[in-house]
Amino acid sequence: MSLKTKYRDIIVPKLMKEFGYTNIHQVPKVVKVTINRGLGEGAQNAKALESSLAEIAKIAGQKPVVTRAKKAIAGFKIRAGMPVGLMVTLRGDRRDAFLERLINLSLPRIRDFRGISPRSFDGRGNYTLGLREQLIFPEITYDSIDQIRGMDITIVTSANSDEEGRALLRELGMPFREN
């Protein structure tokens, strides 16, 4: 069952009952998924930028945007306009396909995985997940990487509170850790 049909047929009625919504448009939904990676030392290294671009494009199925420094910071040896990170925003079918792969394939591949922290909500129902390595994604092979790099994944929902957002993600299959 795809994420879209599961949401429409199972999750919407369940959340309407749980939170007492009167209209299906009140039920929270996933608006977008943003994948972000800071380059760190790769800001000076063009090869690291290229490999990061290729990795994020493989993982997301969409070419990332290079984020650039707005100001020069001498302490970090960064000049204005230098690449400092990569970002990709997924919506629609790409978002659903990525979430399905993340929940069912990638998260279980994390070493010593006991669930993700239920505390990483921002107060408005959005969830941010930090990953330490890119190898958990099946698209990335060990031989194709030059260095282990992490990334941040933000799941933006239309929920009004963390409680609603947590209920939505739990129903979608996110494996939250029991504290």
From Swiss-Prot:
GO terms for molecular function: rRNA binding; structural constituent of ribosome; tRNA binding. Keywords: Ribonucleoprotein, Ribosomal protein, RNA-binding, rRNA-binding, tRNA-binding. GO terms for biological process: translation. The keyword tRNA processing does not apply. Pfam families: Ribosomal_L5, Ribosomal_L5_C. One of its GO terms (cellular component) is ribonucleoprotein complex. Belongs to the universal ribosomal protein uL5 family. This is one of the proteins that bind and probably mediate the attachment of the 5S RNA into the large ribosomal subunit, where it forms part of the central protuberance. In the 70S ribosome it contacts protein S13 of the 30S subunit (bridge B1b), connecting the 2 subunits; this bridge is implicated in subunit movement. Contacts the P site tRNA; the 5S rRNA and some of its associated proteins might help stabilize positioning of ribosome-bound tRNAs. This is Large ribosomal subunit protein uL5. It comes from Synechococcus elongatus (strain ATCC 33912 / PCC 7942 / FACHB-805) (Anacystis nidulans R2). The gene is rplE.
